[in-house]
C-alpha cells in the first residue's frame, strides 16, 4: 500500500516506520496534526495480521486523536503509534525500549501514552529511553488504576449530554 494514496492518509504531517531487526521491531508512528500543539496519543501493541492493517489502524486512530484532543480543549494535536507484536511476547520490554528511541528522536513533536497492550508499567519501560511518555506507573500511587480516568471521562460525557438535553448536571 502506498501511504500517500491510502484512504486514511488524510494529509497526515508525518508517518514514521520504525524497524530494529536486532529485536524484531516493526512499528509505525503517525502524526496527524500539530496545529494545536505537539501530537499526543497512545502506543498500541497488537499482533496485526499485516503492516497494511497496522498502517490503516494507526492512520485512523491518529486522526481521531486530533479531534479528541481538540474537543477536550487540550493544547495537543493528534498522533498515535503501533508496535506490531503480541503484548505477551517474551521480548516485549526490548521491543518497547527499541521503539521508544524512535519516539525520542522526534524531540517532543509526538508524546505517547498507554493503549491496548501497553499499560502504565510498559509506559515506564518506554520512559527509560524517552522523555515524551504520559501515564507511567511511576507517576501514580501504588494500587492506582488509570481506568479511574476512563470512568471519569465517561461520567463527564454523560453529564455534558444531560446538560445539553435537560439543562441538568446533577445525576
What do these predicted ranges mean?
Residues 1-144:
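N-terminal ligand-binding/catalytic initiation module
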Amino acid at each position: 500500500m502506498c501511504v500517500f494514496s491510502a484512504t486514511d492518509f488524510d494529509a497526515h504531517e508525518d508517518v514514521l516506520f520504525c524497524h530494529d531487526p536486532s529485536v524484531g521491531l516493526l512499528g509505525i508512528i503517525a502524526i496527524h496534526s500539530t496545529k494545536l500543539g505537539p501530537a499526543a496519543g497512545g502506543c498500541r501493541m497488537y499482533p496485526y495480521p499485516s503492516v497494511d492493517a497496522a498502517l490503516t489502524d494507526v492512520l485512523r486512530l491518529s486522526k481521531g486523536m486530533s479531534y479528541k484532543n481538540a474537543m477536550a480543549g487540550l493544547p495537543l494535536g493528534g498522533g498515535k503509534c503501533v508496535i506490531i507484536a503480541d503484548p505477551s511476547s517474551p521480548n516485549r520490554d526490548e521491543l518497547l525500549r527499541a521503539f521508544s528511541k524512535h519516539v525520542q528522536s522526534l524531540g517532543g513533536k509526538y508524546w505517547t501514552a498507554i493503549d491496548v497492550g501497553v499499560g502504565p508499567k510498559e509506559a515506564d519501560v518506554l520512559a527509560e529511553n524517552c522523555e515524551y511518555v504520559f501515564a507511567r506507573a511511576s507517576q501514580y500511587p501504588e494500587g492506582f488504576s488509570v481506568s479511574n480516568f476512563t470512568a471519569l471521562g465517561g461520567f463527564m460525557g454523560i453529564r455534558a449530554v444531560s446538560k445539553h438535553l435537560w439543562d441538568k448536571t446533577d445525576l
